[in-house]
């Protein structure tokens, strides 16, 4: 099956408009943002925000959560860098979490997140078929 770039762009724009309207209807605190052509949704603090983000998460191919300890308590203000496999950063956010959803082109990426001086990294492949969920958890020593 050949995918046409114009059709792909229309589908992405339609999805993003749906995301924007859902987010706007939910709360003013949740804001879908676009930085250097990368659309993302960051937040999830409080039950209402968490529920909203979980409801629209399927629109994003890459979904991340950040937590600590054995009980998995959510954390925020986590610096995140997503790089291509050549090491070139394609997305950076100084204060992510506790949930971060990102739209990226299909490909293989390395996601690095830092909390309390410890960096965790995970590789992920986005194939355009199914979204991917990454969970970063910093357990107590």
Go through the PLM ranges and name each one:
Residues 2-11:
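Bacterial N-terminal signal peptides that target proteins for export
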Residues 11-17:
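Hydrophobic helical h-region of N-terminal Sec-dependent signal peptides
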Residues 19-23:
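N-terminal signal peptide c-region/cleavage motif recognized by signal peptidases
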Residues 25-78, 115-141:
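Primarily secretory-pathway and cell-envelope proteins
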Residues 79-90:
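Short amphipathic beta-strand segments in non-cytosolic proteins
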Residues 93-94:
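Short hydrophobic alpha-helix segments
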Residues 97-103:
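Short, surface-exposed beta-strand/beta-hairpin micro-motifs centered on an aromatic residue
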Residues 107-113:
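A short tyrosine-centered beta-strand micro-motif
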